Amino acid sequence: MKHRYLKSNLIACLLTATITGGCLFTSCEDWTDPEEVDYTIQDPSEQNPELSARYIESLRVYKLERPHYITYASFNNGIEPSKNEGDYIRSLPDSLDFVTLANSENITTADREDIPELQEKSTRVLYHVDYAKKMAELPDEAALGAWLDKAVSTVAKLKMDGFAFSGIPLYGGTDIEQAARKASARLIVSKLSATGKALVFEGDPSFVDAAD
C-alpha cells in the first residue's frame, strides 16, 4: 500500500513537471517571436518644429547678443566613416561659440554636411591654419602665399566663419631670419584678415606684431 502511494505521488509529480515545462516552453516561444522595430533617428526639427525653432533662436540670442564667457574648442576632424557618434563634429555641445577644425586640410564629406548644422546653432566653425606645424614645408613667401590662398578658398567654398592660425616666434637667429619670420606673420595676418571673417591666434603672441 505504501509503495502504491509513493508510485502515485511520483506519477503526479512527473505530470506536473511536464505540464509546467510545456507552459514555460510555450511562453519562451511567444517571447522570442521576431518583431520589427523602427530605429529611424529623427532630427529634433522633425519631431517638434516649433520647439526646435525656439531653441535655435535662444542659442542665437545668447551667443550673439548677450554678454557671456566665450567657449572655444578644437576638434580632431577628418576621421574616416565611424560608428562612434563622438567622431563627428555634429556631436559637439550646442553651447560652443567657436570650434576650430584641427585637420582643416582633410575636411571629409561628413564634416561638410555637419558644418551648417553647427552654424544653425550659432557655433562658428574655423579653419585651422597651422603654420607652426607646416612652416618647414613653406620655405618662402610664394609657397606660404599659395598655401594661404588654398585655405581662404576652402573657407569661402564651405562658408566657414573664419580662421585660427598658429605660429612660433624666432627667439634667436640672424637679422635676416628674424625679418623673414616677421614677414611670414604679416603675410598670414594680411591674407586671412582680408576676408573680413573671424581671426583667432593660437600660440605665443610675440609671433605677431601689434601693428599687424
Identify the residue ranges that each predicted region occupies.
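Bacterial Sec-dependent N-terminal signal peptides
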Residues: 1-8, 17-65
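Chitinase-like catalytic core of GlcNAc-active glycosidases
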Residues: 66-212
